[in-house]
Structures are given as C-alpha cells and as structure tokens.
Amino acid sequence: MFPRVSTFLPLRPLSRHPLSSGSPETSAAAIMLLTVRHGTVRYRSSALLARTKNNIQRYFGTNSVICSKKDKQSVRTEETSKETSESQDSEKENTKKDLLGIIKGMKVELSTVNVRTTKPPKRRPLKSLEATLGRLRRATEYAPKKRIEPLSPELVAAASAVADSLPFDKQTTKSELLSQLQQHEEESRAQRDAKRPKISFSNIISDMKVARSATARVRSRPELRIQFDEGYDNYPGQEKTDDLKKRKNIFTGKRLNIFDMMAVTKEAPETDTSPSLWDVEFAKQLATVNEQPLQNGFEELIQWTKEGKLWEFPINNEAGFDDDGSEFHEHIFLEKHLESFPKQGPIRHFMELVTCGLSKNPYLSVKQKVEHIEWFRNYFNEKKDILKESNIQFN
C-alpha cells in the first residue's frame, strides 16, 4: 500500500493562453493523488488543463517524496526559444547597423530636395533614430517629382565667396543663396516653357492637304516606249487603255502646210540693250590682259585720251580753268569784298585769314568764294547783340 500524498502546490487560474513546457504551472497541474487501495492510480482533474499530451508532467513515487522528470521535447523547446530570442536580438542589431550605414551614405542634393543639410545653431540633437528616419521620409515625400538641373559651378563658387565674405554662418548663408538662385532658375524655366507654343500633331495632320500638281507629266519620247509585237494577243479592254495612254505630239505627224515655214522659223530680232556693269568690267579685264607696255610717247597720248585725259597743243596749264569766264586776278585778290567789315579788330583779322585761304583754293569758282564771304557777313549781323556785350564793333 502506498500512502496518499496530501501535499499540493497552488495552481494558476484557468487562462486562454496555453501553458509552456517546463513552467511551474505545468508541473503544479501535473501533481497527482496516488493511491493503491483499489489497485488503481487516480489523477487529479487539474492535470488535464494542458492542451497537448507532451506538456503533461507525470510524477510517481514510493514514499512521501515527489519525483519530477522533464520530457526531452520540453528541453528542446526551451533551447529553441532561447535561440529564437538571441536571433531576434541579433537581427534587430543588424537592422539598426544597416540603417545607420544607409543614413551615413545618403547625400541629399540641394537641387533635388530643398532641405538644409547643415545643422542650424541652437538646435537640440535628435533623440532617437526614428526621428531622423521620419524627417528623411517627410523630405522625400514633399520633394518635387520632376528633376531639377543643378546650378552651374560658377554660381556655386560665387555664392561660396559671398558667404565667406559675410560675418554670418557660412554654411547657412551659402545654402540660402543657392536656394534663391535655384528658385530664380525654376521661375525663368517655367516662363520659357509657358512661352513656347505646344505643338499638337493631331492639329498638324488635320491641317495637312495633299498637294496635286496641275502641270502635266513629263512626256516620254515615243522611241523609249515599249512596243509590243503585232501578233500579241490583246486581252479584253486593252484597246481602251492603249487609247488613253497615247499622247499626241504637235511636232510629229504629217504637216498640213497651213502656215509658212520660213515665217515660223525666222527668229525675232534682238533688242539692243546697254551692257551691264559686269560686262563692262569683264571687257576691261580682257583689255588689261591683252595690253602691252607703252613703247613711245604717241601710245602714251593715245592711252591718256582713252582715259579722258585730253591735252591741247601747245600745252596750256590753265586749260579749262576759266569755265565761269572770270579773270585770274578775281580768284586771288578778294580784299574788295571786305569793305562792309570793320577796319581793325578780331573780326577783320579773321576775315583776312578767310580771304587768304580762298585765294589759294583752285577748286572753287569766284562766285562760290564771294558767297562764302557773304555767309560770314550775315552771320556777324545776326550776332550783333553778343558782339556789343563783348565790346566788339561791327560797322
């Protein structure tokens, strides 16, 4: 006979979660009341709370001491749970390291994302990695989808030079300048795109028309046409097509002799037209090519005559000088035209210089010289008020 084991451990109340193997609740639920009065073994009903047979722990003994044994499967589950927890911890560490490496390798360009890459002063550091990831996600979400062309290196260098010259924070100043320049570039690009008319291919195709030339096709020579043999069997309807394809030429066939042949073939007289400038220049070039050097004085005189240099014999140096019919002294002695000017003073001195220059000018006629002196007389008469203020007499 075996004595009844009256020692029981406290049991956990019934819950929805299954009991893990090797836990104190499972061992407590597996305690049984052993009796051998009727030769049978009785189990406590609380031992049936576990869902699987492997989780049931059986305890047997020949005395008041309780003997407990664990299944091999429970030991394996504990080892696997430890391994899974360790693998999860290692995966978390690896993911954190990967995220840190990605964040370090990321470079947010100023042209694609309008975010300040430099840390502004008096800003607290981020508390956790999640905050940095959230900010980067927001920046990429609100970033413009279309690609913006980066600024030229000359503008970037100029902005950095301006930032270095200012007493403020260099990085923030440079980023602000570059953002302003980028905004200006975007506005100008948008204006250019708005000015460009949008080409619609459907409108172009709808407006297109097939141009058909009104001119007849080039007439082919009859000898170049393909001529079939006389014994060739014609199919029905070929005669009509041949009649349509035949072309009549006014210069072939039998003449009717209605018009006179000589009157038709006589060419119309060409009208005399003056040679063009290019023809004259070409004739001069031909003459210079064929021209030989002058051998005597007569040939030289002939050449001068062709050039318009005519000489009178005996030689007179004043030939053609008296075209207006004036004498020689009238060209030189011009003091008689200065009677209305003052006898002395700056005006008299100025007019004497004018007459001296006119007397030495062989290209002006006497009439032109007198008109020149009269112009000065009228000019000084108009400026009498100014001359009086300057104490200059003009009588």
Curated annotation (Swiss-Prot):
Region annotation Disordered: where it falls in the sequence: 70-97, 175-196
Question: Its principal location?
Answer: mitochondrion
Would I find DNA-binding among this entry's keywords?
A: no
One Gene Ontology term of the molecular function aspect: protein domain specific binding
Its Gene Ontology cellular component terms are: mitochondrial inner membrane; mitochondrial small ribosomal subunit; mitochondrion; nucleolus
Q: Where in the cell is it found?
A: Mitochondrion
- Which Gene Ontology terms describe the biological processes this protein takes part in? mitochondrial translation
So which domain of life are we looking at? Eukaryota
**Disulfide linkage:** none
Which residues form the organelle targeting sequence per the record? Answer: 1-65
Q: Which UniProt keywords apply?
A: Mitochondrion, Ribonucleoprotein, Ribosomal protein, Transit peptide
Instruction: Indicate yes or no for the key word Transit peptide.
Output: yes
Q: Which InterPro entries match?
A: MRP-S31
Segments of skewed composition (Basic and acidic residues): 183-196
Instruction: Give the UniProt family note.
Output: Belongs to the mitochondrion-specific ribosomal protein mS31 family.
| Assembly with partners or alone | Component of the mitochondrial small ribosomal subunit (mt-SSU). Mature mammalian 55S mitochondrial ribosomes consist of a small (28S) and a large (39S) subunit. The 28S small subunit contains a 12S ribosomal RNA (12S mt-rRNA) and 30 different proteins. The 39S large subunit contains a 16S rRNA (16S mt-rRNA), a copy of mitochondrial valine transfer RNA (mt-tRNA(Val)), which plays an integral structural role, and 52 different proteins.
Q: What is this protein called?
A: Small ribosomal subunit protein mS31
Provide the species name.
Homo sapiens (Human)
Q: Which gene encodes it?
A: MRPS31
